């Protein structure tokens, strides 16, 4: 569940890179949570003859960050170094890759269990994992838990991973077969995901294999043939993002941002901020991977964006002036704007994605405001 801070930590960790015809950016932010338990991996060019392959993943830790941190450093090695992945001589086949990914997950989970037992079970943390392994011909989506990945192809959501929730019929059946129950949509009324790495308290049912436990470390793997013409971008994100934005919303929002900037870190920062302002209370991490045919910056879109920002600035000034005596608080300004039909707001992001612009104008016009009223708080914002 996790405890919350009095105000969100909005400092971000960023990275970006390019290679193998891909560009990526990432952003992660602690937000309202007391701890930062997310982790991520981004590797372009893999060792051992896989220089044209790339790997990206987001890990959403719970009950501590140890498992997420260990996976972000070691999961890729466990996947690419097992015999199932390597197969016989030459490049691994599609089946080799899929089997190798599954084996890698089971191996790292068992390895972490042994380490945990040596420490007398001191680590009770767990982590989801969502990732993509991109070869020259295929994109392999990998999912274990309720983080999510999606592929935008030809301006639409073409594929997205399915969240592993305890209430899903197949997941529920496995949990019940292992002697557990699903209460308040949680495993034994406690854990909100039905598949994860770590969480060894839920993996000790005697007579059941590793994939038959209350919580399973088995990933779902989907291979998608790459389309140079139509593939645009991939988004990997933890549930702190998906809790407040749907697949189509996020796809539309990212596409609209790519038309106004080619800075992928900036796009990811906008996603994270927008989700905070839409009410997400969780840690947030997002990786954006762009294929060669991703949307390009359009002068028309840039002009439209500048006009929107100017319009919002003038409206904030008008709202403050209209108040007469005393300056209205930021919540009042946001609510007033939310009640209006403002043209050309970014799709998917809507007014929340312009909160930084609105706040900057508000602060400029009201430099002596009391800091207590400065709410990055999203409580009761609208």
Swiss-Prot record:
This is Protein phosphatase 1A. Enzyme with a broad specificity. Negatively regulates TGF-beta signaling through dephosphorylating SMAD2 and SMAD3, resulting in their dissociation from SMAD4, nuclear export of the SMADs and termination of the TGF-beta-mediated signaling. Dephosphorylates PRKAA1 and PRKAA2. Plays an important role in the termination of TNF-alpha-mediated NF-kappa-B activation through dephosphorylating and inactivating IKBKB/IKKB. Residues 23-291 form the PPM-type phosphatase domain. Its cofactor is Mg(2+); Mn(2+). The lineage of its organism: Eukaryota, Metazoa, Chordata, Craniata, Vertebrata. N-myristoylation is essential for the recognition of its substrates for dephosphorylation. Mn(2+) 2 binds at residues 60, 239, 282. CDD domains: PP2Cc. It catalyses: O-phospho-L-seryl-[protein] + H2O = L-seryl-[protein] + phosphate; O-phospho-L-threonyl-[protein] + H2O = L-threonyl-[protein] + phosphate. Belongs to the PP2C family. It comes from Bos taurus. InterPro entries: PP2C (IPR015655), PP2C_BS (IPR000222), PP2C_C (IPR012911), PP2C_C_sf (IPR036580), PPM-type-like_dom_sf (IPR036457), PPM-type_phosphatase-like_dom (IPR001932). It is an enzyme of class 3 (hydrolase).
């Amino acid at each position: 569940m996790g405890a919350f801070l009095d105000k969100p930590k909005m400092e971000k960790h960023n990275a970006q890179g390019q290679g193998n015809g891909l560009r990526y950016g990432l952003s992660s932010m602690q937000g309202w949570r007391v701890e930062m338990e997310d982790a991520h991996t981004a590797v372009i060019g893999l060792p051992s003859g896989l220089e044209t392959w790339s790997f990206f993943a987001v890990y959403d830790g719970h009950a501590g960050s140890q498992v997420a941190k260990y996976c972000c450093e070691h999961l890729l090695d466990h996947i690419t170094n097992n015999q199932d992945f390597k197969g016989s001589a030459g490049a691994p086949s599609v089946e080799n890759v899929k089997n190798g990914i599954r084996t890698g997950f089971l191996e790292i989970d068992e390895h972490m269990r042994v380490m945990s037992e040596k420490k007398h079970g001191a680590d009770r943390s767990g982590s989801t994992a969502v990732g993509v392994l991109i070869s020259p011909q295929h994109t392999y989506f990998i999912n274990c838990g309720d983080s999510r990945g999606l592929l935008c192809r030809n301006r639409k959501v073409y594929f997205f991973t399915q969240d592993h929730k305890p209430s899903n019929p197949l997941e529920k059946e496995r949990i019940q077969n292992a002697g557990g129950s699903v209460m308040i949509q949680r495993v034994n009324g406690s854990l909100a995901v039905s598949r994860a790495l770590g969480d060894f308290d839920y993996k000790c049912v005697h007579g059941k294999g590793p994939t038959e436990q209350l919580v399973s470390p088995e990933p779902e793997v989907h291979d998608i043939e790459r389309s140079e013409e139509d593939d645009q971008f991939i988004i990997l994100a933890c549930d702190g993002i998906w809790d407040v934005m749907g697949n189509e919303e996020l796809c539309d929002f990212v596409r609209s941002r790519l038309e106004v900037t080619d800075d992928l870190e900036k796009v990811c920062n906008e996603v994270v901020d927008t989700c905070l302002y839409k009410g997400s209370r969780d840690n947030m991490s997002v990786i954006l991977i762009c294929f060669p045919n991703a949307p390009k910056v359009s002068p028309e879109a840039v002009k439209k964006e500048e006009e929107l920002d100017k319009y919002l600035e003038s409206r904030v000034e008008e709202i403050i002036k209209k108040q007469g005596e005393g300056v209205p608080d930021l919540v009042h300004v946001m609510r007033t704007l939310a009640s209006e039909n403002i043209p050309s707001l970014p799709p998917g992001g809507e007014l929340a994605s312009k909160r930084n612009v609105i706040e900057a104008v508000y602060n400029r016009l009201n430099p002596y405001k009391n800091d207590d009223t400065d709410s990055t708080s999203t409580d009761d914002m609208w």
